[in-house]
UniProtKB/Swiss-Prot annotation:
Eye lens. CDD domains: Argininosuccinate_lyase (cd01359). One of its GO terms (molecular function) is structural constituent of eye lens. This is Delta-1 crystallin. Delta crystallin, the principal crystallin in embryonic lens, is found only in birds and reptiles. Despite possessing the necessary catalytic residues, this protein does not function as an enzymatically active argininosuccinate lyase. One of its GO terms (cellular component) is cytosol. PANTHER family: ARGININOSUCCINATE LYASE. InterPro entries: Arg_succ_lyase_C, Argininosuccinate_lyase, Fumarase/histidase_N, Fumarate_lyase_CS, Fumarate_lyase_fam, Fumarate_lyase_N, L-Aspartase-like. Homotetramer. It comes from Anas platyrhynchos. Belongs to the lyase 1 family. Argininosuccinate lyase subfamily. The gene is ASL1. GO terms for biological process: arginine biosynthetic process via ornithine. Keywords: Eye lens protein.
Amino acid sequence: MASEGDKLMGGRFVGSTDPIMQMLSTSISTEQRLSEVDIQASIAYAKALEKAGILTKTELEKILSGLEKISEELSKGVIVVTQSDEDIQTANERRLKELIGDIAGKLHTGRSRNEQVVTDLKLFMKNSLSIISTHLLQLIKTLVERAAIEIDVILPGYTHLQKAQPIRWSQFLLSHAVALTRDSERLGEVKKRINVLPLGSGALAGNPLDIDREMLRSELEFASISLNSMDAISERDFVVEFLSVATLLLIHLSKMAEDLIIYSTSEFGFLTLSDAFSTGSSLMPQKKNPDSLELIRSKAGRVFGRLASILMVLKGLPSTYNKDLQEDKEAVIDVVDTLTAVLQVATGVISTLQISKENMEKALTPEMLATDLALYLVRKGMPFRQAHTASGKAVHLAETKGIAINNLTLEDLKSISPLFSSDVSQVFNFVNSVEQYTALGGTAKSSVTTQIEQLRELMKKQKEQA
């Protein structure tokens, strides 16, 4: 254990920290992922100190050499974390002192861990969100391109898990793609809030050494500089926003996963998952379980839990930095890892599943065309509410007779309304049914094709911003 004098806050305290307190306080196991970005921030700050006249050129070169050595050790995985390292910032400073001696202590001149930890977190999130955005756009592309290939496949659409109207399989795929484009847009908005530099804010009052914050911004490639030092070191709006966007994204993926789980059951038989994304049973040899989709579905709860915990941490804090904020890094890193894995698995599932066009078509039933029967009467001049009632009577008559609605005779239909004529037979055609929904957003082939074209264009724009 390091002596009290070696600790960052050494000098004020007598005796050693209680071991249980040390264990509770440490966050090093979580924060090792921030090691490299902490080095980046320290390199930028060292250059700013030299410009401000705090470091000589020789001292700067020595510090930069030490930081680069630590970066090299990190890349090789040989950096050693000690029991006394409370967090990654402490570990890097301790290692720098081991490499270059007491001159390492100059690096922290005018800099507080309060600003250091939030700068590191923002740098980590900037990098991570770019990767997440790339994976998300790949998933959207996979959905869109599959929709283009399988555009002629028709299956039942459901409301309340009851057969409702026939739709194109592509319409189903695109419904999820469109939702995910909104998530992609929201990730872009979060990036804007992350891209504000807090470094140079000190503990809360600012930096007293005439540090060039514009130089820091440029070195670390932030878009702008924080306006108020007290706000900069304590605000975690960007964390809440990211976790909120991640939660909504996982809810969308959970819905898609649930749909696909249902469609993959033997009761539906609409699709089969690849063996690469399925597992078996330890007891029942015949089982092929959609574990990939079930895990995607479960992760929504995990991510929402992270959001809820951070909101509860923040709701009771006074201004500026408090140790409670240590919880933010574990939440962010866990959600970054979860999203990165889930998006890749979802893309793998969508790209490899096999659909059964035959089973989808078998599931189409004439009763699903009852709305079309009402629309037939509307086109004959009947008000929709009356047409709806007439179609309902036709459904009831067919049920009474124990036959499908398309097997009602013309006389049966005329007994309901004289507007029925021989051309009513054209209503009972599933291709004709989907093709009438030509308005933008509908399930007609022309509309689905337009959706695909617009989504491809939107993806190009979002890729440029990723």
